[in-house]
Amino acid sequence: MAKQTKQKQEKPFEESLWDAANKLRGSVESSEYKHIVLSLIFLKFISDTFEKQRKKLIETGYEKHIDAVPAYAKDNVFYLPEESRWSFIQQNAKQEDIALKIDTALNTIEKTNKSLKGALPDNYFSRLGLTASKLAALIDVINNIDTLANPHEDIVGRVYEYFLSKFAIAEGKGKGEFYTPKSIVNLIAELIEPYKGKIYDPCCGSGGMFVQSVKFIESHKGSTKDISVYGQEYTSATYKLAKMNLAIRGISGNLGSVAADTFNKDQHEDLKADFIMANPPFNQKAWRASDELVDDYRWDGYETPPTSNANYAWILHMVSKLSENGVAGFILSNGALSGDGTEKEIRRKLIENGLVEAIIALPQNMFYTTTISVSLWIVNKNKKERSILHAGITKNLRNRENEVLFMDLRKRGEPFEKKFIQFSKKVIEEVAQTFHTWQQMQPNEKYMDIAEYCYSANKTDIEKQDYSLVPSKYIEFINRDENIDFDENMNSLKSDFSDLLKQEEQSTYELLNVFKELGYEIEL
């Protein structure tokens, strides 16, 4: 019998594209190359939609309007002058000055379409020095993306998102902060349910929180017209990525007039958001000078956050932006759960004010940029008993002002890209179900504490733990190895290490004296 040939599994479309594009990177840094690739994907997409609209105008008898900007803008299509179209770039791909032609095209598109102001790379292609032959080959790769092949499938969005994640992985530790892993964003969306109102991200990176919010609404049969998007981003290049990302999805967002520091140049001072989704920089140091922002309105009723770490500055900034029924879901390093001094005083006040709704410990290695342990915080301005209408379903929320839900998801992730962890759709659904059951009054379904998974603590429980929000202090663990008191162990290590340093200092002092007495004084 003839040996059966094993059929090779076909790679997903976006993976094949990535492989082809990455081979052409050469010596260009990944952090720079992403702007080249993503800009070309964006240019291909808006050119395809432009050509489709142009054809529609001709076919419907509006040929005389084919060069009128309003004829495109009315359908959220960007108007492109001839030298800015993909067809022009493709025709000139083999020219030595193709980099300059692409820069000119992007610059012209910005000038022609006000909503894209500040969105596109400025003279990026000319500056990076990618050879004309490699740039031509990359144009051929991007040309394989049929952005309009299936009107029911977000092909270009899928490719853009895939490339963002791959670039974040490629840049690795210390970089790639522009991207929050998709499964984390999905979890936040499922917990805070941003169906209707203003959504805000004070450190929006490439805009992933907004994209997943829209996907959440669409998957739950809601209307994206019911939300408005607000964001801010400090890094200019990432700000451009976000504006392109939103434009590709047809999301109208206000990301501020410029890329700017959220603390010192808030682009949305008067904003009151219904939902906040954020992944602030972890343990950001020197975020303000010692004499800056001391009496800022955002800290009203709280201590001024320390200059050494911005974690609590981010928390208070977000609290100040919430509407009276606003909810925030954000990621912080685990250090914020138990910090002492000023941080502890702010945390105590947040708990006493009934703002902290849930603390969820996440697995390590979920982020492409760091191995640091992190937690998801849910902060809610209104934990009182009330009814809300979501997607046509009435939810009766019970009073939770005196409670905080702790959850531990450290063992609930699954392997991803060999060395990373992500949440499956099933796990996200289970966690959301637990959280919403805890929030609500349901006659047929009641919340229960589950060992090694979840525990509902009251303010008295938390006060007994000296206002620590470390989940393992509350959740019961059957495996005692998991039930390690982090604070106690770290304080013990700190004490031991302090003793060792004192012993070393004494030994050094004695050794220096010996050499001095011998007439060979050592200068340090």
Where is each model-derived feature located?
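Non-catalytic, mostly N-terminal accessory regions of nucleic-acid modification and defense proteins
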Residues: 1-195, 254-267, 361-364, 382, ...
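Conserved Class I SAM-dependent methyltransferase catalytic core
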Residues: 16, 23, 32-45, 239, ...
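Short, contiguous acidic/charged loop-to-helix segments that flank catalytic cores in large enzymes
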Residues: 27, 287-309, 334-342, 363-369, ...
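Hydrophobic alpha-helical scaffolding
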Residues: 128, 149, 203, 231-235, ...
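Conserved S-adenosyl-L-methionine
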Residues: 174-278, 283-302, 313, 333-334, ...
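Feature representing long, continuous alpha-helical segments
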Residues: 211, 240, 278-280, 312-316, ...
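Active-site lining segments that contact anionic ligands and/or coordinate catalytic metals
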Residues: 272-273, 309-311, 325-331, 356-357, ...
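Accessory, often C-terminal, charged low-complexity segments
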Residues: 283-304, 311, 344, 349-351, ...
